[in-house]
C-alpha cells in the first residue's frame, strides 16, 4: 500500500476526518564534505524518499500525533514545559516552539505521519521530519515565514530540543530541494544557486556499508580544531581569511612549517574540496559527467588520506567502484562508516551491484544495503 493511502486510512480511523497532506525529502550531498563548518560550499539535493504527514487543526492547544513507523501515539501541549519524552515527537514539538519564537502562530493539530527515508544511512530523516512540519504549520496558520527561516526552524529544533549541533545543509536541502537540480550553498553567506542534475543514462546509487565506527564525534571535533588552527595561522598574513575556505592553497604553503603536519593535511583537503565543488558546478553546466565523477574520486582520496575520516569498508567500496568502471564514487557524510555515493552508467549498474554483493560480504562478513535515489522536490503540499 502506498504511503499516502496508509496515512489517510490511519488518520480517518484515529480522528474521523480528513486533513491536508504535506511532504518533505531526505537528501544527498554530491560533493562538498566537511566544508560546511569551514564556511565553504556544499552541493546537496533533495531525494525521492522522505516524510509524509496528514495534518488537521483540532481547535485545542494540544498536538495529537501518531507515528506509523514507531506505531506510537503521543499527545503534548505547546508550552516549553510540555516537551514529550519520545525522540520523534520532540522534533515536532521543537518545530512548534521554534515557529512561536519567530512570531508565528501555532495551535493544536492532529497528525499522522510516516517515512521511507532509510534510517542510519546518513540521508537526514530528521531534517525531512522537521521540514515537513515547519512547512505544514507555516501553511495551515498562514504564518508567511520565508523559506530561509523554515530551514532555520529545523536547524534550531536540532540544537535546542534534540541536542544535535548540526549545520544548515540538511534542512536547507529539505526545504529548497528542486526536482532535477542540486543546490550549491555557500555556508558562510547562505547564498545559493541551482545547477541542473538530470544525468540521462546514469543512476545515483548509495551503498550503505552498515558500519559505524565509534570514534566519530571526538574525531570530528579534532578535525574542526585542526581547520581552525590552520585558518588562524594563515590569517596572520592574510586578514581576509575568516574561515579556512577563504584561503588560497599557496597561503597554506606559506605556513606549512608553523602548524602541525596533521593540521596541514586537514587544511589541504578542505581548500581542495572547496575548489572541487566549483569545478563540479562548471562541469554540470557543460553536461560533463566524467569530470563530475573524477572529482568525486578525488574527494574520496582526500577524505581517506588527508582528512582521514574513511575506513577500510568505505575504501574497499571505492576501489571496487573504480574497478567496475563506475563514473564517480566517494564516501558521503561525516565518515567512519555509512555510505558511498556512486554515479553509475546504466549499462554498468547490474555488474557493479553484483560485484559488491559478492565481494563485500566475503571480506567483511555482512551484507551492505543499496538505495537508488533520484533528485526530487523538497517540502511541499501534496495534492
Q: What feature does the model see in each segment?
A:
Residues 1-22, 28-41, 75-79, 85-198, ...:
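Gly/Ser-rich oxyanion-binding loop with an adjacent helix/lid
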Residues 127-128, 339-343:
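FabD-like malonyl-/acyl-CoA
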Residues 44-46, 54-57, 103:
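Short, charge-rich binding segments
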Residues 2-27, 52-85, 181-328, 343-383:
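C-terminal nucleotide
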Residues 336:
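Glycine-rich phosphate-binding loop
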Residues 39-46, 223-224:
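Short Gly/aromatic-enriched secondary-structure transition segments
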Amino acid at each position: 500500500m502506498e504511503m499516502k493511502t496508509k496515512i489517510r486510512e490511519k488518520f480517518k480511523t484515529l480522528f474521523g476526518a480528513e486533513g491536508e497532506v504535506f511532504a518533505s525529502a531526505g537528501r544527498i550531498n554530491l560533493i562538498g564534505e566537511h566544508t560546511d563548518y569551514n564556511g565553504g560550499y556544499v552541493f546537496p539535493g533533495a531525494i525521492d524518499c522522505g516524510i509524509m504527514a496528514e495534518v488537521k487543526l483540532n481547535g485545542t492547544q494540544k498536538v495529537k500525533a501518531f507515528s506509523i513507523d514507531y506505531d506510537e501515539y503521543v499527545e503534548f501541549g505547546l508550552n516549553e514545559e510540555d516537551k514529550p519524552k519520545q525522540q520523534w515527537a520532540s522534533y515536532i514539538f521543537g518545530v512548534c516552539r521554534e515557529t512561536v519564537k519567530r512570531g508565528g502562530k501555532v495551535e493544536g493539530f492532529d497528525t499522522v505521519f510516516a517515512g521511507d527515508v532509510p534510517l542510519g544511512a546518513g540521508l537526514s530523516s530528521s531534517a525531512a521530519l522537521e521540514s515537513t512540519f515547519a512547512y505544514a504549520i507555516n501553511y495551515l496558520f498562514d504564518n508567511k515565514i520565508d523559506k530561509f527561516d523554515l530551514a532555520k526552524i529545523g536547524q534550531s529544533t536540532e540544537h535546542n530540543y534534540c541536542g544535535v549541533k548540526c549545520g544548515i545543509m540538511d534542512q536547507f536541502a529539505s526545504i529548497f530541494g528542486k526536482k532535477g537540480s542540486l543546490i550549491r550553498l555557500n555556508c558562510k553567506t547562505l547564498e545559493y544557486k541551482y545547477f541542473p542534475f538530470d544525468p540521462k543514462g546514469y543512476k545515483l546509487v548509495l551503498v550503505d556499508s552498515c558500519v559505524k565506527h565509534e570514534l566519530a564525534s571526538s574525531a570530528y571535533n579534532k578535525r574542526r580544531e585542526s581547520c581552525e588552527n590552520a585558518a588562524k595561522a594563515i590569517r596572520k598574513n592574510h586578514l581576509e581569511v575568516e574561515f579556512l575556505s577563504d584561503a588560497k592553497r599557496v597561503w597554506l604553503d606559506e605556513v606549512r612549517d608553523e602548524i602541525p603536519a596533521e593540521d596541514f593535511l586537514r587544511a589541504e583537503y578542505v581548500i581542495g574540496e572547496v575548489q572541487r565543488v566549483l569545478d563540479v558546478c562548471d562541469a554540470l553546466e557543460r553536461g560533463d559527467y566524467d569530470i563530475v565523477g573524477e572529482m568525486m574520486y578525488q574527494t574520496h582520496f582526500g577524505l581517506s588520506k588527508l582528512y582521514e575520516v574513511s575506513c577500510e569498508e568505505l575504501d574497499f567500496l571505492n576501489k571496487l567502484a573504480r574497478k567496475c568502471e563506475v563514473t564517480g564514487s566517494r564516501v558521503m557524510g561525516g565518515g567512519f562508516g555509512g555510505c558511498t555515493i556512486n554515479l553509475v552508467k546504466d549499462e554498468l549498474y547490474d555488474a557493479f551491484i553484483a560485484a559488491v554483493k559478492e565481494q563485500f560480504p566475503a571480506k567483511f562478513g555482512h551484507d551492505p544495503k543499496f538505495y537508488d535515489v533520484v533528485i526530487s522536490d523538497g517540502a511541499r503540499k501534496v495534492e
